[in-house]
Amino acid sequence: MKDPIGRPVRIVSICFREGTKSLSEIATIVDREAARGCDLVILPETWLGTTPEPLDGPAVTTLRALAHQHHTYIVSPIYRLDGKRRLNSAILLERDGQIACIYDKGYPYWSEFDLSTTTSIGNDAPVYAADFGRVGMAICFDVNFPEVWERLAEQEAELVVWPSAYSAGSSLQAHAINHHYYIVTATGTKHCLAYDITGEKLLNERSSDLHISRLTLDLDRGIYHQNFNMEKRDRLLRERSKEVFQEKWLDDEQWFVLKAKRHGFSARALAKSYGMEELRDYLRRSRREIDRMRGGPFPRKTAARG
């Protein structure tokens, strides 16, 4: 990409029903799409079917070779065989084909415990520092459990990839609104959704058979609250008008979004140099300081009845 503005990441989401495409078919599609140029390819949840494979099995081995050949990241979610354990895993492959990060589904769906080998439960949601930004993963039923998404935000995720059997819709939008990271899906419903750091829907595409979506996101866009930022913002936009601009103003939420205008400049770095605090940091600091004044965190669980 020649002289990019901001921090763009080119994403390909490939959506199809679990077990309906062979490894050879998917390898051909990934090869073709990656050859067109992209930074990240995403496949849907357990795309191979219910038979688990080890990390040195044919699926991961084939996709590792394609990641290396095309110098692209790939997320391959499969049932992973780890010794005698089955895990529902999203495997992030680096541009050189190495395994960068593995997320094991923290909240498997109930039917996953009824398979011939029951599905083991993941314990954490890691975030990986890719060359384009910080990437986290969650899978399908995880969408219903806020702690997974909070954990990703705690680790400064900028993009969350969500492979799934279904679409989820506004449930995902809520997480984008609350945590201000991008969310991109690859689903078995042949439906791709993408949500902005503002929570706005960026993409909503589907097909009757296999569906492929392509989109580019700028991970350098920054979102801010009006509180304590307006004078600093005004000075930034006045003094650095050639490098950064206000892309969005969300009046009801009292938020605004800054974006770079020129190659070689970061909107978020410039805003920070002017003393501006990003929205996620502002809310985190507010929670920490108000909890300290209270004498402890606000209660999150209600005592069991009975």
Model-predicted segments: where are they?
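Active-site catalytic loop in hydrolytic enzyme cores
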Residues: 82-155, 170, 174, 178
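Active-site-proximal beta-strand elements of phosphoester/diester hydrolases
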Residues: 8-20, 134-142, 161
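N-terminal, active-site-proximal structural segment of metallo-dependent hydrolase catalytic domains
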Residues: 1-32
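Short, structured patches in soluble enzyme cores that scaffold and shape functional sites
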Residues: 15, 78, 92-94, 104, ...
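C-terminal beta-strand edge segments of enzyme domains
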Residues: 127, 190-306
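Eukaryotic scaffold repeat domains enriched in small/polar residues
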Residues: 19, 36-39, 143-146, 305-306
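Cys-nucleophile CN-hydrolase/nitrilase-fold catalytic domain and related Cys-dependent amidase chemistry
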Residues: 20-102, 167, 178
